[in-house]
Amino acid sequence: MKKFRWVALVVVVLACLLLWAQVFNMMCDQDVQFFSGICAINQFIPW
């Protein structure tokens, strides 16, 4: 039962990371000033 809880936790964390990646890509496409630094870093991370 404990193993299932760990798997669920990992799945939720991965889903959140994917969601953040999508949000970052959207913001980068719109060229938001605040995200420009993050976008520069984001290009080096293979999403």
Swiss-Prot record:
User: Where does this chain mainly localize?
Assistant: membrane
Instruction: Look up keyword Ribonucleoprotein and say if it applies.
Output: no
Question: Which is one Pfam family of this protein?
Answer: MgrB
Is Cell membrane a UniProt keyword of this protein?
Answer: yes
Please list every transmembrane segment annotated in the UniProt record, as residue ranges. Answer: 6-26
The Gene Ontology CC terms held by the record are:
plasma membrane
What name has this protein been given in UniProt? PhoP/PhoQ regulator MgrB
Q: Which organism is it from?
A: Escherichia coli O127:H6 (strain E2348/69 / EPEC)
